[in-house]
Structures are given as structure tokens and as C-alpha cells.
UniProtKB/Swiss-Prot annotation:
This is 13 kDa ribonucleoprotein-associated protein. Coiled coil: none annotated. It is found in: Nucleus, Nucleolus. It comes from Debaryomyces hansenii (strain ATCC 36239 / CBS 767 / BCRC 21394 / JCM 1990 / NBRC 0083 / IGC 2968) (Yeast). GO terms for molecular function: U3 snoRNA binding; U4 snRNA binding. One of its GO terms (biological process) is maturation of SSU-rRNA from tricistronic rRNA transcript (SSU-rRNA, 5.8S rRNA, LSU-rRNA). The lineage of its organism: Eukaryota, Fungi, Dikarya, Ascomycota, Saccharomycotina. Keywords: mRNA processing, mRNA splicing, Nucleus, Ribonucleoprotein, Ribosome biogenesis, RNA-binding, rRNA processing, Spliceosome.
Length: 126
């Protein structure tokens, strides 16, 4: 695998990537996940996104570089994971996924897990 694109910052390490993908998979089961750059953009604009996950091996990466700008405007944490294929698998689809958004739900059973990952992503951004 080639070196990740330097524009893909912050990039999660392997342990954090695994935790993020686990949360993504569980969020998908609870219908708290939006897949794709366009749907991620919609969740940000509506203010229902907890955090955004993007794939660092997206080619060309510029097709999702509008998301970090939007995230910073809306004060939503974001992170890059190394593989779009792994993100696609975690999202429960057979195709690669370049961006995903975990959405808010106050009554969710996963609220604590989501906030835990959100805190870890925020520490990467500092």
C-alpha cells in the first residue's frame, strides 16, 4: 500500500481505526449511519452529525476535501481511516465508501461509545 495522502489529516492509527470501524458497524445496525460524501454533507448541514469518517485512499482525494471545511464550520470532529474498502465493509455495503457520518440520537444504546470515539477524534485534531 502506498503512503497515505498528506492532505488526509488527521489519520487514525490502526487501533483507533478498528474502534471507529466497530462503532460504524454498530451505528449501521441502529440506523445511525449515513454513507457517502453527499449524505455526510447533508447531515452536517442539518446539524445531526456526531462525527465524520473519511477514507484516506480516495482518488482523487479532492472530492471529499470540502468535508473538513464544513466540519470546522459546524464544530464537528472528523477523521481519516486508511481504507475505503474497510469503511465500505463496516458500513455494510459491498462497495468502497469514501465518507460516512454517524448521526445523533439521544435515546441510542450506543451514546456512550459514540461520545468516547468522538473524544478520541477530537484529541487527534489538537
Amino acid at each position: 500500500m502506498s503512503a497515505p495522502n498528506p492532505k488526509a489529516f488527521p489519520l487514525a492509527d490502526s487501533a483507533l481505526t478498528q474502534q471507529i470501524l466497530d462503532v460504524v458497524q454498530q451505528s449501521q445496525n441502529l440506523r445511525q449511519l449515513k454513507k457517502g460524501a453527499n449524505e455526510a454533507t447533508k447531515t452536517l448541514n442539518r446539524g445531526i452529525s456526531e462525527f465524520i469518517i473519511m477514507a484516506a485512499d480516495t482518488e482523487p482525494i479532492e472530492i471529499l476535501l470540502h468535508l473538513p471545511l464544513l466540519c470546522e464550520d459546524k464544530n464537528v470532529p472528523y477523521v481519516f481511516v486508511p481504507s475505503k474498502t474497510a469503511l465500505g465493509r463496516a458500513c455494510g455495503v459491498s462497495r468502497p465508501v469514501i465518507a460516512a457520518s454517524v448521526t445523533t440520537n439521544e435515546a441510542s444504546a450506543m451514546k456512550n461509545q459514540i461520545y468516547g470515539i468522538k473524544d478520541k477524534i477530537e484529541t487527534l485534531l489538537i
